Amino acid sequence: MTLLWCVVSLYFYGILQSDASERCDDWGLDTMRQIQVFEDEPARIKCPLFEHFLKFNYSTAHSAGLTLIWYWTRQDRDLEEPINFRLPENRISKEKDVLWFRPTLLNDTGNYTCMLRNTTYCSKVAFPLEVVQKDSCFNSPMKLPVHKLYIEYGIQRITCPNVDGYFPSSVKPTITWYMGCYKIQNFNNVIPEGMNLSFLIAFISNNGNYTCVVTYPENGRTFHLTRTLTVKVVGSPKNAVPPVIHSPNDHVVYEKEPGEELLIPCTVYFSFLMDSRNEVWWTIDGKKPDDIPIDVTINESISHSRTEDETRTQILSIKKVTSEDLKRSYVCHARSAKGEVAKAATVKQKVPAPRYTVELACGFGATVLLVVILIVVYHVYWLEMVLFYRAHFGTDETILDGKEYDIYVSYARNAEEEEFVLLTLRGVLENEFGYKLCIFDRDSLPGGIVTDETLSFIQKSRRLLVVLSPNYVLQGTQALLELKAGLENMASQGNINVILVQYKAVKETKVKELKRAKTVLTVIKWKGEKSKYPQGRFWKQLQVAMPVKKSPRRSSSDEQGLSYSSLKNV
C-alpha cells in the first residue's frame, strides 16, 4: 500500500511539475531563512511565501482555490520528492501553512519547498532546514539570538523565544532555566518566572548563554523545546552622552613640510545607544573628500568596550602634501542619536629651523675635547693640584690644636728600618718639607716607662706614620703597641690620622688591627730608587696625607741632618 502511494504521488507530482515548469514563479532558495532545530524536538515551520513574498495570507489563497503543496530535497541530493505525511504517529504533518515535525530526526535535514498553485497560477520558495544535535551544556552550532540588557538599570527580563503555537493556552508547560551548564536557582540577582527570566540588576558578570527548556504534554506524549539565547550587558541610556571627539584636539598641531605624508586621526567615542546609527566623516574646506581634487585616503577602524561603547577612528591620509593642502580646513564630524559634534584639526606648514650643523658640530667637538683634556690633566696631575690648593687656600691645621709634633713615626726596631726612618724619611720631611717628626728612640728621655711615653707622644702628634715591613707585624713589639694606640685614638677621638707607608711587602698577617687598617686606609708604597726624589709621586702622596702647615719650608741643607743631596748615597 505504501509503495502504491509513493508511485501515485510521484506520478501526479511529475504531472504538476511538467504543467507548471514554464509558468511557476520560483523565488529560489531563501538562505536568509535558514531554520535550525534540535534533534528529537518538535518543530513548526510556516511557509515563507505568506510572510515575505506574497501580499495575501493563506486563508485568502485557500478561498481563491489555491492549494499549498510541500516537498523536499534531502541533504547532499538533487532530486526533489514529496513529503511523506503518513509516517507513524503523524511525525510529519501539515496544518494550513505550517509544516509540523513531532519530533525531528537528523535525517530530516534538507531543503524544503512550499508551492502555492492552481491551474493558472503557481508560486514557490525553498528554505533550508538543519537538524542539529545538542550536548549536556546545550552547546550547538546554532546561531544564537542576542538579547541586550542595560547595565545597572533596574529590573529587566528576557523571554523564552520561539515557543508560540506549539501548545494551546490551556496547557501549562514546565520551564527550566539554565546559565551555561548550571540550573538557575538561588541566584542573587536572576530569578526564573515561568517563560520569563528576571534580572533584578544587570552586571557584566551576567553576560553569557541562557537556555530555557519547555516541557509540555500532547496526545499522551511529552515533548521538550530547547531555546538558547545570548545575554549581553551594555551601557545604560542614563549614562549616554553625545559623541566625544578625542582627536583632533587643541593640544596637537600637525606640522608638515611640502612633500611629506599628512596623517590626521579622528578618534570618536560613542556611548552605547540601542539602534543608534553612529557616523564619523571628514570634510575638507567644507566639502566631502571625494569632491576635492587631491589624493585623499581614509581608513576606519572600530573597537568596542565590554559594555558595547564604541570607539571609531578614521585616519585621513595625504601621501605627498602640498603647501596648498596645508592651508586647507580639515574638520572631523561625528553623529549619533544623542547629537552631532565637529572638531577642526590644526594643520600648518613647518618652518625649517636654521641649520647650524657645522657650528654645532665644532662646538660639541671642542667641548668634548676640553672635557677629555681636563680629565686627563686631573688624572695625571691631581696630586699637584691638591698640593697647590693646600699651599694657597688650605687652612693651617697646626694653629691652636695643642699638638707638639706633626708626625709620630712607628717602625720596626732593626738596622734597615731605622736607617730608612732616620736618614730618608726624617731627612726629607724635616729638612725639605719642614715637618716636625717625633721618633721615639731619638726624642724619648732615658729611664721613662715605654708604654706611657709612647701613648704620650702619640697624643701630642697630628699624624701616626706607620712604616710597614715584615718585621713590623711580629707580636709583642713596641711597633704594634704604637699601631694599636693610634688606631684606637683615631676611632674614638678622631684627633689623629694614621698614614701607612709600605717599606717592604708584608705577607698575609694575623694582626687584626693591621688588617683593618689596610682595608680602610690608603697604603703609600716605597719603590726604592724611584721614590728617593723629593718631588716624586711617593713624596707628593705623603704630603697630601700630612697636616696643612703655612710655615715656610726649611731650605738649608745642613740644618738638623741630611738634605736631599745626601740621599743619593743612602
UniProtKB/Swiss-Prot annotation:
Disulfide bonds join 24-122, 47-114, 137-181, 160-212, 266-332. Residues 69-85 are annotated as: Essential for interaction with PTPRD. Residues 1-20 form the signal peptide. Residues 558-570 have a biased composition (Polar residues). It catalyses: NAD(+) + H2O = ADP-D-ribose + nicotinamide + H(+). GO terms for biological process: cytokine-mediated signaling pathway; inflammatory response; positive regulation of synapse assembly. It is an enzyme of class 3 (hydrolase). InterPro entries: Ig-like_dom, Ig-like_dom_sf, Ig-like_fold, Ig_sub, IL-1_rcpt_fam, IL-1_rcpt_I/II-typ, IL-1RAcP-like_ig, TIR_dom. It comes from the Eukaryota. GO terms for molecular function: interleukin-1 receptor activity; NAD+ nucleosidase activity, cyclic ADP-ribose generating. Residues 403-546 form the TIR domain. It holds the Pfam family TIR. Belongs to the interleukin-1 receptor family. PANTHER family: INTERLEUKIN-1 RECEPTOR ACCESSORY PROTEIN, INTERLEUKIN-1 RECEPTOR FAMILY MEMBER. This is Interleukin-1 receptor accessory protein. The lineage of its organism: Eukaryota, Metazoa, Chordata, Craniata, Vertebrata. The gene is IL1RAP.
